[in-house]
């Protein structure tokens, strides 16, 4: 009898092993499954952090460097020779990564994406691949280590942003790009090996031709080191088949797990995962990613409306802050994130774990749904009533979460919501509908 039990156990283990081998993303790279994407789809809000030596001057990270290949953005203010020496003055002694992560969590964020290397090539960890890194600043300490440890401590999912562009590396876009491939693959290996669990790899644009990049080798390594990691859609955003066509099946995984509209709210889209990345600092030149004291800080109300517009469109919001050169977050950003967090604590249940719809969002606001519940998020409007698209189903009950009592009438032309002006929320009036099953 015991022998039969052991045989059965052995067969179960063999079957499990075969299943794992069949689903080994390193052996056969593939996009993330729906199950692997679920935490991200439920999270809705992440914190993006752009930082580096550019903060010493309060200029746009990378783009302020005069002499980069794209001098048409209007950011260019610092000669390359001066920009490339800013790291010698980068000494953020007041950095408290634990405080940053507490701030993110209290704001309602479920994940954080931190800049490890931007287009200027400077590395915020002690990489072995170049001397242009944090070790050779007055600060010297591994900032990525501090971010990773604090994120893990506070239960935030960890993401690394990595720019595959590198305007200061001598081998970037040279010849067949093989030396640069070796360089950046080795850096990705460091980032996915030395910091515990990494949940997101957020690439940002590489240029050239398909044949110049070993994408299959890269993604096999990524999935070998972090089997359930999510990867955005920018690993090959500006790689064009001018000389070589992508090999069969390559686009299936290189196109990534989700889209990334930038400085704009994505369109309503329930069939493809997407995440809008937007800055808390608004600048006239369209930047504001890194510390920009010349910019305007979006207040909590504006950030909430951006979040609601994103989530009702079935997307996530990656909201960006740019720390000061001291290592501190700007006080007004901290204040507005705390206010946003207070709102999320009260109303986040209408966003977290939901999907956008069942009707498209618009200037009026939008809707989220989960089970038999639909939450209407209504931005301020004129008049007594608001006519929305028709709902696919019959409303069983209505509850106004932000005060007052709305009435909802279903007609052949749509859904009419009526609520007196004094009962409307200044930012987002939320009406909960229970639908008949």
PLM features: residue spans?
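Positively charged n-region of N-terminal signal peptides that target proteins for export
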Residues: 1-6, 104
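A detector of low-complexity, intrinsically disordered, Ser/Thr/Gly/Pro/Ala-rich segments
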Residues: 2, 9-10, 427
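Bacterial N-terminal signal peptides
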Residues: 6-17
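Mature catalytic domains of secreted/periplasmic carbohydrate-active enzymes
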Residues: 22-437
């Amino acid at each position: 009898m015991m022998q039969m039990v052991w045989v059965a156990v052995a067969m179960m283990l063999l079957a499990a092993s075969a299943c794992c081998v069949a689903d080994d993303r390193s052996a056969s790279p593939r996009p993330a499954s729906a199950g692997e994407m679920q935490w991200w789809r439920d999270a809705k809000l992440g914190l993006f952090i752009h930082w580096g030596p550019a903060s010493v001057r309060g200029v746009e990270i990378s783009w302020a460097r005069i002499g980069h290949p794209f001098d048409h953005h209007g950011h260019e203010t610092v000669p390359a020779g001066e920009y490339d020496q800013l790291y010698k003055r980068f000494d953020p002694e007041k950095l408290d990564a634990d405080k940053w992560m507490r701030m993110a969590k209290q704001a309602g964020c479920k994940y954080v994406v931190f800049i490890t290397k931007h287009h200027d090539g400077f590395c915020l960890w002690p990489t072995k691949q170049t001397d242009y890194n944090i070790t050779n600043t007055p600060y010297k300490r591994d900032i990525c280590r501090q971010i990773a440890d604090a994120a893990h401590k506070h239960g935030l999912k960890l993401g690394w942003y990595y720019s595959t562009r590198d305007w200061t590396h001598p081998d970037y876009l040279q010849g067949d790009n093989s030396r640069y491939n070796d360089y950046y693959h080795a850096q990705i290996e460091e980032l996915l090996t030395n910091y515990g669990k990494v949940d997101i790899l957020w690439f940002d644009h590489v240029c050239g031709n398909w044949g110049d990049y070993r994408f299959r080798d890269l993604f096999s390594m990524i999935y070998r080191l972090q089997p359930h990691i999510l990867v955005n859609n920018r690993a090959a955003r500006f790689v064009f088949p001018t000389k070589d066509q992508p090999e069969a099946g390559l686009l299936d995984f290189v196109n990534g797990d989700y889209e990334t509209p930038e400085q704009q709210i994505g369109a309503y889209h329930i069939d493809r995962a997407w995440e809008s990345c937007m800055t808390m600092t608004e600048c006239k030149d369209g930047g504001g990613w890194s510390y920009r004291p010349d910019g305007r800080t979006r207040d909590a109300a504006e950030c909430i409306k951006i979040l609601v517009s994103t989530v009702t469109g079935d997307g996530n919001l990656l909201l960006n802050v740019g720390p000061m050169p001291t290592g501190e977050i700007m006080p007004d950003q901290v204040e507005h994130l705390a206010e946003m967090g207070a709102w999320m604590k009260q109303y986040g249940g209408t966003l977290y774990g939901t999907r956008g719809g069942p009707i498209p969002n618009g200037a009026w606001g939008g809707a989220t749904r989960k089970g038999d519940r639909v939450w209407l998020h209504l931005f301020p409007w004129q008049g007594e009533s608001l006519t929305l698209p028709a709902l696919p189903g019959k409303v069983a009950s209505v509850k106004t979460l932000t005060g007052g009592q709305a009435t909802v009438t279903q007609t052949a032309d749509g859904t009419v919501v009526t609520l007196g002006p004094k009962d409307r929320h200044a930012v987002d009036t939320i009406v909960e509908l229970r639908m008949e099953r």
